[in-house]
């Protein structure tokens, strides 16, 4: 019998290893494929921009034009990569400018290739003459650049605003003696070079205006490097001004990790935020609130994620889980009533919202797979990552009015 058990265990272990190897291989293949696509898009962008400029500047040297474009692209990308290195706070202004430049570059590449594809389709359908006339090329070039500038400016202005998204959720079966608890959900603040004191003050003010009973933060409070904060003490004080009856609770996100991990925890502790690391607490004898470690942290993150142990004295109370990534939904069953997530930013900038919508079962809003599955709310986040732009998506705070049973009511 022991031999059979050992054989089964070994087979299961080998199967898991094989599955992991397959997933790793597929992930690498997908990354290589995406890299090839990106290189192709950049090459075509340079080609189209050269054609546009050559109409204005006759005798423009193609190799020189290509080298200048390539150097600009590599500089923007290199500065962004360097901004991810801890301890580079002295260059914060440069990094901020680069983040905006990255957003503009993204739209130049997207729009240029979209226009190129459109003109190709129009030629195939004989709706325009071939070769494309100089006037059509000039107009398409001007409109493309204006649109890229317009979307970048709009995205920057829109990202400075915070929207409120409201939900009404019942936990458990409807019964007498239920009460309403207002839970305010934040995520993906990304404190760093871009999100600093001014934006955090807006967040705190908006949260307090909602008069929450409890505040929950679904990860990515930091942007991976707490040393990038110009005045962490002041930011900690601002964080501490969030007011609620039952306190502020958080789980960690993939960016809440790295060399400054312990400093991040100290910051949150000093601000009165309780971080739940695969643990749970009972809130007002009304529901259990659990928080998870992130499933794929970028850098040091303390202990590894472990199985969630619900409090033994929770009894019939509904269970709410803070889990940063909605890709983990398959870990939960009918024992969980509500899962609160962030991470996706809802793609942050069009058309990336189409990608997150395709990748995740739910990348934004309310979701429930079936009548016995947990309810899920994914927020698009109160901050930004990378380019500080919001196009077709919002920086938001979620106001969730929970209708919950009260334990004392059940016992009476």
How does the language model describe each region?
Residues 170-412:
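Soluble catalytic domains of enzymes that build or remodel membrane lipids, polysaccharides, and related
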Residues 23-24, 30, 64-67, 71, ...:
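A broadly tuned "polar low-complexity/structure-edge" signature
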Residues 160-173:
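Alpha-helical transmembrane signal-anchor/signal-peptide segments
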Residues 2-160, 409-411:
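Non-catalytic terminal accessory segments
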């Amino acid at each position: 019998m022991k031999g059979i058990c050992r054989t089964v265990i070994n087979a299961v272990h080998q199967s898991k290893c094989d599955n992991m190897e397959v997933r790793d291989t597929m992930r690498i293949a997908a990354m290589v494929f995406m890299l090839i696509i990106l290189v192709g898009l950049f090459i075509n962008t340079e080609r189209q921009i050269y054609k546009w400029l050559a109409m204005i500047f006759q005798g423009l040297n193609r190799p020189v034009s290509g080298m200048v474009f390539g150097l600009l692209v590599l500089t923007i990308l290199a500065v962004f990569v360097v901004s991810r290195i801890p301890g580079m706070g002295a260059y914060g202004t440069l990094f901020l400018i680069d983040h905006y430049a990255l957003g503009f570059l993204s739209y130049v590449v997207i729009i240029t290739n979209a226009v190129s594809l459109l003109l190709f389709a129009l030629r195939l359908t004989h709706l325009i003459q071939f070769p494309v006339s100089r006037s059509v090329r000039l107009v398409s070039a001007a409109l493309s650049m204006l649109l890229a500038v317009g979307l970048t400016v709009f995205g920057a202005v829109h990202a400075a605003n915070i929207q409120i998204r409201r939900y009404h959720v019942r936990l458990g079966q409807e019964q007498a003696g239920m009460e309403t608890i207002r839970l305010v959900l934040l995520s993906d603040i990304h404190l760093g070079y871009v999100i600093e004191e001014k934006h955090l003050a807006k967040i705190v003010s908006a949260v307090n205006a909602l008069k929450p009973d409890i505040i929950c933060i679904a990860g990515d409070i930091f942007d991976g490097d707490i040393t990038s904060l110009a005045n962490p003490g002041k930011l900690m004080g601002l964080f501490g001004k969030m007011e609620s009856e039952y306190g502020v609770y958080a789980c960690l996100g993939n960016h809440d990790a790295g060399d400054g991990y312990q400093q991040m925890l100290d910051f949150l502790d000093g601000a009165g935020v309780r971080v739940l690391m695969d643990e749970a607490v009972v809130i007002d004898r009304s529901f259990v609130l659990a928080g998870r470690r992130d499933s794929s942290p970028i850098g040091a993150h303390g202990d590894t994620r472990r199985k969630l142990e619900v409090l033994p004295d929770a009894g019939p109370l509904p269970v709410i889980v803070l889990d940063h990534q909605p890709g983990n939904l398959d870990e939960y069953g009918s024992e969980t009533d509500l899962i609160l997530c962030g991470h996706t930013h809802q793609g942050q900038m069009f058309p990336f919202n189409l990608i997150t919508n395709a990748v995740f079962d739910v990348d934004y809003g309310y979701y429930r797979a079936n009548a016995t599955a947990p309810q899920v709310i994914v927020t698009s986040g109160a901050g930004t990552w990378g380019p500080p732009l919001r196009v077709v998506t919002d920086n938001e705070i979620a106001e969730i009015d929970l209708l919950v049973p009260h334990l004392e009511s059940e016992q009476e």
